[in-house]
Amino acid sequence: MILDTDYITKDGKPIIRIFKKENGEFKIELDPHFQPYIYALLKDDSAIEEIKAIKGERHGKTVRVLDAVKVRKKFLGREVEVWKLIFEHPQDVPAMRGKIREHPAVVDIYEYDIPFAKRYLIDKGLIPMEGDEELKLLAFDIETFYHEGDEFGKGEIIMISYADEEEARVITWKNIDLPYVDVVSNEREMIKRFVQVVKEKDPDVIITYNGDNFDLPYLIKRAEKLGVRLVLGRDKEHPEPKIQRMGDSFAVEIKGRIHFDLFPVVRRTINLPTYTLEAVYEAVLGKTKSKLGAEEIAAIWETEESMKKLAQYSMEDARATYELGKEFFPMEAELAKLIGQSVWDVSRSSTGNLVEWYLLRVAYARNELAPNKPDEEEYKRRLRTTYLGGYVKEPEKGLWENIIYLDFRSLYPSIIVTHNVSPDTLEKEGCKNYDVAPIVGYRFCKDFPGFIPSILGDLIAMRQDIKKKMKSTIDPIEKKMLDYRQRAIKLLANSILPNEWLPIIENGEIKFVKIGEFINSYMEKQKENVKTVENTEVLEVNNLFAFSFNKKIKESEVKKVKALIRHKYKGKAYEIQLSSGRKINITAGHSLFTVRNGEIKEVSGDGIKEGDLIVAPKKIKLNEKGVSINIPELISDLSEEETADIVMTISAKGRKNFFKGMLRTLRWMFGEENRRIRTFNRYLFHLEKLGLIKLLPRGYEVTDWERLKKYKQLYEKLAGSVKYNGNKREYLVMFNEIKDFISYFPQKELEEWKIGTLNGFRTNCILKVDEDFGKLLGYYVSEGYAGAQKNKTGGISYSVKLYNEDPNVLESMKNVAEKFFGKVRVDRNCVSISKKMAYLVMKCLCGALAENKRIPSVILTSPEPVRWSFLEAYFTGDGDIHPSKRFRLSTKSELLANQLVFLLNSLGISSVKIGFDSGVYRVYINEDLQFPQTSREKNTYYSNLIPKEILRDVFGKEFQKNMTFKKFKELVDSGKLNREKAKLLEFFINGDIVLDRVKSVKEKDYEGYVYDLSVEDNENFLVGFGLLYAHNSYYGYMGYPKARWYSKECAESVTAWGRHYIEMTIREIEEKFGFKVLYADSVSGESEIIIRQNGKIRFVKIKDLFSKVDYSIGEKEYCILEGVEALTLDDDGKLVWKPVPYVMRHRANKRMFRIWLTNSWYIDVTEDHSLIGYLNTSKTKTAKKIGERLKEVKPFELGKAVKSLICPNAPLKDENTKTSEIAVKFWELVGLIVGDGNWGGDSRWAEYYLGLSTGKDAEEIKQKLLEPLKTYGVISNYYPKNEKGDFNILAKSLVKFMKRHFKDEKGRRKIPEFMYELPVTYIEAFLRGLFSADGTVTIRKGVPEIRLTNIDADFLREVRKLLWIVGISNSIFAETTPNRYNGVSTGTYSKHLRIKNKWRFAERIGFLIERKQKRLLEHLKSARVKRNTIDFGFDLVHVKKVEEIPYEGYVYDIEVEETHRFFANNILVHNTDGFYATIPGEKPELIKKKAKEFLNYINSKLPGLLELEYEGFYLRGFFVTKKRYAVIDEEGRITTRGLEVVRRDWSEIAKETQAKVLEAILKEGSVEKAVEVVRDVVEKIAKYRVPLEKLVIHEQITRDLKDYKAIGPHVAIAKRLAARGIKVKPGTIISYIVLKGSGKISDRVILLTEYDPRKHKYDPDYYIENQVLPAVLRILEAFGYRKEDLRYQSSKQTGLDAWLKR
């Protein structure tokens, strides 16, 4: 039996060691022959010699590839040839892999990150733990003497206990007379004795409980201190335990023995409120063990009284650990055999890692190449696998009888196997049989077994076997299969040949491009951003949109392009021509769309045949808008030679000295001039008109600093270039001088300028595109000409000519031309516009020659009337009516032919055909247009017919011919066609797509690049000659690997099938068998949430977390997150970080509410989103479980049950980082400077000095900060500036630091984000300095009010973030009246940051200034401490008002594991397979019989391995919410969820009463009896008839006493003990009684051992109100009972008969 493997190095070579147990003996086998290797995929095999010649360095030694062997492997379902590169030593791999990967011939390298010893197990097919050897197990535990504040390992180990199958004993160094205790002379001898025990017993497995993090590291540290060699292993060279890092945690390895730490196994396996050894022992084995608190251990050891009790406690720890080890070890051994790795590894691995190791082993056995894990830059992202997208039925409340529980056996694995869900079967073309996933629509080939399903078939059987062996305690197979979502990546070879036309929207402009040229150009310009996967290149983009259609609603949509894709291709291509003249060239695997049975389906290139029907556009919807042309911008790309005589002018009226005055004003605004000009208001008014600033009653506010900066740059140029032209009373500037700054012109200002030639015609710079301009462009594109010729004087003459023979048309041409370009000349057959500006505009918009004419983008994006005007004018020039009465448009340009089809489709004209004859493209239109109309009946085109094949598929009968829409309606209305089936074809009439028949398919060979787009959501785009819809490659996770084996499509499909089968089963059991199923929610995008990403705290808008759509379920879109944790609140009231697997968004179609906390602090939530309110009362009840006071509440419920919401109020990061005193002073100074200092600027002084104003506190600041910092060299010197307390501080480095980090580009003060990562002490120091400079302490009603006031709300928001990080609750509000200076309004408004947690602020931050700190502390002494959330991680904030607000756009939510809560805008909010059923009123026997009949029925309908199982029958049960219910089975066993009171801070009387209530309801079916039980207990408590031991409350000390800022009852007792010299360490359980009396509860609690019935009386009100009633109301509230109904003296209560369903 193999226990473990590792390797050692001898003579520079690795030797594998196999630790084994064979025939009862331990042995180590060696294998020196195994060599490390990786795989490399090469573009060209001839480069292999270059690869072998690559050199690397390891520890000063040159290393290289020893040998290379070419091998054939399978990779994600296809054959590949790779090179196996062999090395001398495993450490050569990390030294060489980067160099090899960088070689240009290397596509990628694989399997380079598999540890050498694990690789050996996989390759050799060795399975740890296989065999029948009997393993010896030994458990041990230590007790330590820990003094408060001691470092880890400082206190002595006072006892070591151990246990095996034979005995349980204790070793100690104080005399204890017990048969199982061995006494030695001191701690050193005790450790040596334990080492001897391990040697003598020679266990194969050493069991600990949290030994990785406590027992063994502590033992190692003490052994080192005492000079004892801790020989616990069987490796003679290295027998000491070794601490290894495993991710973020540590693990201890004992070579030759398996160190089995129960703690991570238990945490992974079972769900408990607390994981102490006592709690786990009782929960798993149903046994109890003695408990000792820290104060008792300390007292016993120091006084040496009750030493036997301590020894028994220690011995029981070891025995409990051993018994739990016996229970859990066989499960982990089975798991190790399945995975093929050691128990040491498996027991400490996450579920995801276990899956991966299993797949690696199977992949090797099947000759599959494993995909790579992500590197640091490409994080592995995981789908949450519990219920995402699954079916949830809200429970039926009330008490029910005779309930069956049905569950699917291995639901997800069964789905995977049944439907062959695997990356290599996903959407595989050419298969005969497919299974299609519901909702998501992915297809899985059934012609061959997929990689994953073929593995899972055996696993499902294994899982059943392991499940039996593990007694249902752990189910690793099911867990791993639920984690299947991390499987595979697949790159689809769906591609288009390069010369296909593609309409694309780039930066808002519609362009028609050749797909190959376009993608090549983008990739060439952004080489550094192109990612290569195998031979596929992917470029992510964010400025492109494509024309697409929605497959569900069959409507045209504009969708974002996520990526451009190309790859080299050699193989078959197909030229597909449709009857309309459309055509496209695609590869064999690329899909177009067809319709089958009324549904849109993909059909691949090699599957398309003549006569097939293909989806084409009927109407293309555009994002229409009013359009204008910026002529200077339009011509700015022309050469300087072409625009040499172009000028821009503006009227001089009202602009005297304007340009220089504006420049001086702008310079003053940017701080570059000290004095503002006298007439600056003139320029401020102009800037406000442009939208660059906002004028206030006094002063102004810049609305867009970036635009203002560019405007200043423009005027720097204009002021030096503009000239006054007195002849025309205008200012003039040569276009070429300012062409580089044209984009900096605000359009509103440009509207006042004109542009033209120096001595000729000028037109407005901004030209509005209306119907007349559309008509002018239509004339020009059809029969226009733009030319430039040399004239007689040697110059250039420019003209635009519009040709036509019809005088009426010439008159129309003349009118529209003169409207825009002034006087024109009309000749016999043309209109001549002899203006250079007309020439430039037409050339830039539409092209000059017939071959390159185009419809400009401004027409395609204009409103429909403008497009119609263009089309009418074009038809007048290049259109005619064919003898068949069809309209015909002609052009020599292929581009223009495609644009004309696009234009027609955008106007809803779909009866279009395209022809080509004698070098001319003809576009035929077979329907009436708005302008010319014909009365002759036209032939009906494909776009107005429903093909007979489609009719046959839908209605199941033959039709003789295609059917017109009119005829179709008649037959449906008359009932001759089934109306329900007809609905499948409504899209032909109302939708935006039509079907076009394939005329021919030509197969050809192609070699070269092929291209594709990744289009968001719809996964298709418009492409090809004449334009048709093609399926795109899915890109997102599919672009490049994020993990080994990952497939979003597979994950979604499994979930969708799971939902489908659960819904189907519930529907069938209710509709056909008469059962009733009893059991089976967002914020706005601007909401800021607190996250921790890769260890760093960030404050981000929730919408910024949503980077892309990874998948959709219904209308909800999901973005998978990796490495992201959210700040949340657990049920103990503590702030914790929990993983966020995804962020979700959907369009807001609900009411939105704004919850105001102050007039400047709010949160926006939808009507159904839950906030977390706090159930407050007039009394503080610190013993009550906080989680029960956290109530989900909708916005409109605020102010009723809940008046307070929750904000953070505890540090967000550890406070144990080492800090230095001088660094603290440095950050205090920085805070002072930010608050009351000045720095930066262009003066010489500002390069070396900072200014600081300290006022009357100058001497104090000097002594506390400036002198020490000068002594340490942080500042060079400081000089008093005046008698007002101002200093000049000489510190060049500090000046640079402040400039770089504490001012933004606009010169405003800011707080850099790196401060979030500083130690808490330094952040507090900064805040201390800042509040000392700018903070105030005022007294209101005797209570100090701490504020920080500023007019910059952004700055205060940053300060708030720092306060949240250090754990100080705060709020912000704004003044409603403007500030005044010398009696005059300044136009600014003060914002106040107000400290809520004044006590923590005073203790942790406070003020540097003694007078402020003294004032604060003096008034805090008499102020009342808020008790309602004392000692917890949150504070309360009251709702000011709730109002409904208008909102359009996305709303967001995140999934937070375990708590399902997160802080949005610093307010806590909620984020949002089997089933129970009954037949009301029926007898149990009939219900069971019917259930079994249903199982036979449903299992006959379920495909493959899917099977519904009968899991149990329950006599009675009630369901409160979907996570709170209780049922009782036929043997009287009660199962509860979400109702238990199992925490220590519930007294025994509360637990006991709740249990009796459950028994009364479930066993006797009487809610009235339950109520009587409660009243009886309440009466006994009130009359002091309850035994004292039932009133004891147990609470744990969780941290050092000095870290408790608020004093709860257990902390109060612990501090009293500490004051008496009794040491209390974290982990100590305090057991106390609450006494009757007045005052705080923490003053009225005593230890149970101190209670004297002659002197003391417990507080009955406390136990009734805070213990018993809350515990039972968890149940009885569901039946309509309230607190007042349950007191024994109350009147008769109403019953629950209405709830009991008979």
Swiss-Prot record:
GO MF assignments: DNA binding; DNA-directed DNA polymerase activity; endonuclease activity; nucleotide binding
Superkingdom in the source lineage: Archaea
Enzyme Commission designation: 2.7.7.7, 3.1.-.-
UniProt keywords, alphabetically: Autocatalytic cleavage, DNA replication, DNA-binding, DNA-directed DNA polymerase, Endonuclease, Hydrolase, Intron homing, Nuclease, Nucleotidyltransferase, Protein splicing, Repeat, Transferase
InterPro entries the record matches: DNA-dir_DNA_pol_B, DNA-dir_DNA_pol_B_exonuc, DNA-dir_DNA_pol_B_multi_dom, DNA/RNA_pol_sf, DNA_pol_B_thumb, DNA_pol_palm_dom_sf, DNA_pol_type-B, Hint_dom_C
PTM notes: This protein undergoes a protein self splicing that involves a post-translational excision of the two intervening regions (inteins) followed by peptide ligation.
Catalytic reaction list: DNA(n) + a 2'-deoxyribonucleoside 5'-triphosphate = DNA(n+1) + diphosphate
Biotechnology: Used in the PCR method because of its high thermostability and low error rate. Sold by New England Biolabs.
CDD domains: DNA_polB_Kod1_like_exo, Hint
Record's function text: In addition to polymerase activity, this DNA polymerase exhibits 3' to 5' exonuclease activity.
Protein name per UniProt: DNA polymerase
